[in-house]
Design a protein with these regions (language model features):
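N-terminal small/polar loop signature for handling phosphorylated ligands or for N-terminal nucleophile
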Residues: 2-23
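C-terminal accessory domains and tails appended to enzymatic cores
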Residues: 10-14, 33-39, 81-219
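A basic- and aromatic-enriched beta-loop-alpha substructure that forms the phosphate/nucleotide-
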Residues: 16-94
Length: 219
């Protein structure tokens, strides 16, 4: 459990977390507040993440999380730059003429923010495991096999990792039975390395089977 208190000045010898005021470790409202090398100033969230992020995700993932998730929120906090997540959390604030409820609203916002962070952490760690699994599969791939097609034993998120390779298609078991074939995008692009024939577009079931010549083809 944790406890919080709103005060105007920091307490001498206090060993908890002081943020936003009193030149505490996470106060970002001073003239000499820190700014990242890319020009985005630190807010309390960024300063907290700088201290705790590596412990949660490891150094490499913590840096990626800071760039993709923390920095936009810090920028919103410091400049007012629009950010949908910041707006969502801010929507928990009571209306100006609503009696009380500030603490309750705060804890609801904390609960939602906590769930979002937990999900984000799980996704980052899961993607890291996926990248390692893909590396293992690539290392054991038959050198005589078509280098542009990769067959996976199970679904593994791999679009980003494989964008750096020549692999154009990935085949993996479908949770609906059979197999899925998925084209891979070019690095830093929304375009595929190799697309299916345009004649296949929009076709389903028997029409797709007739056009492809595959009796089991479906979309």
């Amino acid at each position: 459990p944790f406890f919080f208190q709103r005060i105007q000045d920091s307490i001498e010898d206090f060993d908890g977390i002081i943020f936003d005021i009193g030149r505490g470790r996470y106060d970002h409202h001073q003239k000499d507040s820190r700014i990242r090398e890319n020009g985005i100033p630190y807010a309390a969230f960024g300063l907290l993440w700088e201290e705790l992020g590596t412990e949660i995700l490891g150094e490499e993932l913590a840096a990626k999380f800071d760039e993709a998730f923390v920095q936009p929120l810090d920028n919103n906090d410091n400049t007012g730059e629009k950010n949908e997540l910041a707006s969502l959390i801010g929507s928990f604030n009571p209306s100006w003429d609503e009696d009380g409820g500030t603490d309750e609203a705060f804890f609801r916002a904390v609960s939602v923010a906590g769930m979002i962070l937990d999900n984000k952490f799980a996704r980052y760690l899961g993607n890291e495991r996926a990248d390692k699994r893909i590396e293992e599969i690539l290392e054991t791939q038959n050198p005589e096999a078509d280098s542009r097609i990769l067959v996976l034993p199970e679904f593994i998120p791999c679009q980003k990792r494989l964008s750096e390779t020549d692999i154009a298609f990935v085949i993996f078991p479908s949770n609906r039975g059979g197999y899925c074939i998925q084209p891979q995008k070019k690095e830093y692009s929304l375009n595929y390395k190799c697309s299916f024939p345009s004649e296949w577009l929009g076709l389903e079931n028997e029409e797709l089977q007739k056009e492809t010549g595959l009796s089991s083809a479906s979309f």
